[in-house]
Amino acid sequence: MKAVLQRVAEARVVVAGETVGRIGQGLLVLVCAERGDSEAQADKLLAKILKLRIFSDDAGKMNRSVQDLDGQGACGGLLVVSQFTLAADASGGNRPSFTGAAPPDVGRRLYDYFVAQARKLHPQVETGQFAADMQVHLVNDGPVTIPLHIAPDA
């Protein structure tokens, strides 16, 4: 499973002119299920995202996670957006291949599972809409952008 995290001051997702998800300070999480992925990869990816220390402490060092933005337990938001294009392979020419992405039914199941688990573990989770044409608006903070990959079990 792949994700790209962007530390944001704020972000929102718009579908057909309607805002469907919005957060203040936190993480925009673009997530993609790949062929061979299961709930195990989703769990590992989510655990990594929630504990990753990419927010600044009082000394300006990246020492805080989205679960503890201020050192006092204040949580930032998670805006989770499905993006199968993270599985793109552009090595063979000028048109990327997406054969590495999970089939749509599996992708939806794993995305829904990831979101459900995130909501169990984190107090503020917003989402886009799976397979929708979305406009993602964000104010990148830093900028800080982190790619993550949890490979399927061998």
From Swiss-Prot:
User: Which InterPro entries did the record assign?
Assistant: Daa-tRNA_deacyls_DTD, DTD-like_sf
TM spans (from-to): none
Tell me where it resides: Cytoplasm
Write down any Gene Ontology CC term. cytoplasm
Reaction catalysed by this enzyme:
glycyl-tRNA(Ala) + H2O = tRNA(Ala) + glycine + H(+); a D-aminoacyl-tRNA + H2O = a tRNA + a D-alpha-amino acid + H(+)
- Partners and quaternary state? Homodimer.
The name under which this protein is listed is: D-aminoacyl-tRNA deacylase
Q: State the organism of origin.
A: Polaromonas naphthalenivorans (strain CJ2)
Lineage, opening ranks: Bacteria, Pseudomonadati, Pseudomonadota, Betaproteobacteria, Burkholderiales
Name of encoding gene? dtd
